[in-house]
């Protein structure tokens, strides 16, 4: 009698291990996840002028980025939303999106990225400098110099200059 119960026990164990648990089950079951459309992430920051990029990241074109501050508290609610969201503009970095001028953010971190710079104005450079306020002085100075160098190299490659 022990032999037929062993495969039956194994089959039951397999069925239970691939179940959809209450905590992580999307609406409509496991197969419905591909059908859900991306929505815009929750607003955050002063005057709700930013968007959540992760549980502790709030960015906006006018604001720059807040990392782990009081302005990002609302972004923790995003983990409890039933559908996925997407914030930001064009893709950048390995898995990020442009969050503010010159800043690329993923769900975990933000970094300066030349892909996210608005084309060539001094106001764009000033806005990128303003976004560095979350960094300490030495790191901010180094990143600022690297961004200026990258911008000069990019302008030097344009024909007719």
From Swiss-Prot:
Cited Pfam families: Hormone_4, Hormone_5
Predominant place of localization: secreted
InterPro entries: Neurhyp_horm, Neurhyp_horm_dom_sf, Neurohypophysial_hormone_CS
Segment forming the signal sequence: 1-19
Disulfides per UniProt: 20-25, 41-85, 44-58, 52-75, 59-65, 92-104, 98-116, 105-110
Localization of this protein: Secreted
Stated name of the protein: Vasotocin-neurophysin VT
Organism: Gallus gallus (Chicken)
